[in-house]
């Protein structure tokens, strides 16, 4: 499955690994937050492994630089002009990101003879490359192109982020990272992603264990 250091994919790894072997794949694109995100994912996976209750394969890292597509001045690459807490969710959209990441992961699945690719997409994701139609068409296209059946799954497609938090409330969610401008590995507390995270914990009725810059937890 495509994995990041964020809440959604971390919980999905844990849920799927209760009943099957999961092969987490992280794709490095050169985005400003990736170093902190990948470190967070590593910590979370190690914590799962220490619990010895889930079957998770070693993390696979792939490379797909997006600077030629977005330009090095784009906020996602430069870290400057990151959408703030009050910005619309659409301001976070990175054109074709799920298509790009999914394509690379699908090739890996085909070569490794893994028949399914899981994505941690949520029901309130408004972007065109997160719709049921996209997932269906992408699965068909990938299977045809690779000559191998690839089932593209989105188990959380009907859930909101607060439901995912409730589902994973017994997991070490403090190890996850959902931030577009992390500071020394911590959430900045000011970007759209941090705002979304705070709101989701509040709606879930679960204490937010996140360490935000400035030392504040909510």
Q: Language-model segments: what does each one mean?
A:
Residues 86, 171-177, 196-201:
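A polyampholytic, Gly/Pro-enriched intrinsically disordered region
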